[in-house]
Structures are given as structure tokens and as C-alpha cells.
């Protein structure tokens, strides 16, 4: 599975992605000025990528950057390589009496495919397993927000409002699962998210184990 190129999903590899440009103007008085400033940051980061191989924004979310970069590089290695590790496959004598080993290529392909798959499964946006309750949970959240506000403001009690006034402002946050009509979908969604997080963590661990095993073979 290739990583998404959609507008909603941030692409950590592409410094000039549309998502970051859109977010740069969020909450700013002048969105145009904010986007211009972000443009010059992108120029700076591009120069850093050229001179040292990574830029400042890569470090901010290093795990996400590597989770995207590594499978992309593995895919390129698989697609463009000219050889395979010679210790893979089996040696045999061909019809001309020459000892050869061309079965290593298929075995190396399978190994690379598995590494690519595991790295992509370890990243939420490219993972093949999705939360089946995501749509229902989002719909319930939209309904909750419309009825009670983003942070459940309308559910605040008189006592909470009074305590907040004494503190000088602020508010008490109320969550969707506090209400009986939303508790079931909230619990189902949360439990599935825990399962998916554990699945992605296992994929990450297995992917790293394979990188350790074949680390010195990752060249062409």
C-alpha cells in the first residue's frame, strides 16, 4: 500500500505539501503573510535536505518521517536494484555446466516486500486495518459537538461554572462518553483503537527486527 497523497493527510517527505501550507495560515490575522513565511521556511528546509540529508522539520516528528522514508527507500531498492544477496537462494549447475544462483532474486523480493508491508502497516495512514467504528464515531462526535459544543461546554453544571468564575475563567471539559447515548460507540471505538495500536506496534517491532537482520544487505 502506498502512502496517501490526499490533502487531509500530511506527507512528511514532501516539504512543500499542501497540508502544511493550509495549516500555516490557521488562526493567523493575515493568512497570506503566514503562507509567505512558510514558503521561506520551506526554502530553508529544502537547502538543509540538500546539504545534510534531513531538515529541521524532519526532526520534529522523526518517527513519522522514518516510517514514511524507509518503506519508500525499500520500494525503490526493490524496483531498481541489479543484484541480490548471494547467500539467499540455492546454487545449481545450469545446462552449460556453470554453477549459478538466480533463485536469490525471488527470495530477496519476498523479504523486501515483507519489510515494506510491515513498515507501511506500522504507520496509521497507510495501515490496511482501519477502525470499523470510525464513521459512526465521527458522526456521533459531530452530533455531540453541535448539541453541547466542542468541549461539552453546555454540559457544565452551575457548580462547575461558579468554580470556573472563581478561578478567573476557563471551563470544565466534558466528553462524549459521559452521556449514555454516546457511551457504547465511544467504548467500541476506543477498544478498537487500542487493538489497532497494538497491531501497528507489533508490525513496527517486526519491521525493525528485519532491518537488523538484513541491515548490511540494503545496498545495490
Language-model regions, residue ranges each:
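Long, non-globular targeting/processing and low-complexity regions
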Residues: 1-214
Amino acid at each position: 500500500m502506498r502512502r496517501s497523497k490526499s490533502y487531509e493527510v500530511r506527507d512528511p517527505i514532501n516539504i512543500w505539501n499542501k497540508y502544511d501550507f493550509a495549516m500555516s495560515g490557521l488562526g493567523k490575522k493575515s493568512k497570506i503573510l503566514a503562507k509567505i513565511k512558510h514558503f521561506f521556511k520551506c526554502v530553508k528546509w529544502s537547502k538543509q535536505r540538500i546539504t545534510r540529508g534531513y531538515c529541521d522539520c524532519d526532526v520534529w516528528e522523526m518517527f513519522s518521517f522514518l516510517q514514511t522514508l524507509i518503506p519508500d527507500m525499500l520500494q525503490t531498492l526493490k524496483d531498481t536494484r541489479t543484484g541480490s544477496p548471494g547467500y539467499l537462494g540455492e546454487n545449481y549447475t545450469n545446462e552449460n555446466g556453470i554453477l549459478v544462483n538466480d533463485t536469490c532474486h525471488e527470495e530477496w523480493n519476498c523479504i523486501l516486500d515483507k519489510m515494506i508491508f510491515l513498515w507501511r502497516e506500522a504507520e496509521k495512514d497507510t495501515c490496511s486495518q482501519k477502525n470499523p467504528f470510525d464513521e459512526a464515531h465521527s458522526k456521533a462526535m459531530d452530533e455531540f459537538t453541535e448539541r453541547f459544543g466542542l468541549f461539552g461546554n453546555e454540559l457544565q453544571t452551575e457548580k462547575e461554572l461558579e468554580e470556573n468564575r472563581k478561578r478567573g475563567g476557563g471551563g470544565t471539559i466534558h466528553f462524549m462518553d459521559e452521556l449514555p447515548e454516546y457511551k457504547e460507540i465511544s467504548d467500541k471505538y476506543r477498544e478498537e483503537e487500542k487493538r489497532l495500536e497494538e497491531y501497528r506496534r507489533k508490525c513496527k517491532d517486526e519491521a525493525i527486527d528485519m532491518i537488523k537482520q538484513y541491515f548490511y544487505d540494503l545496498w545495490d
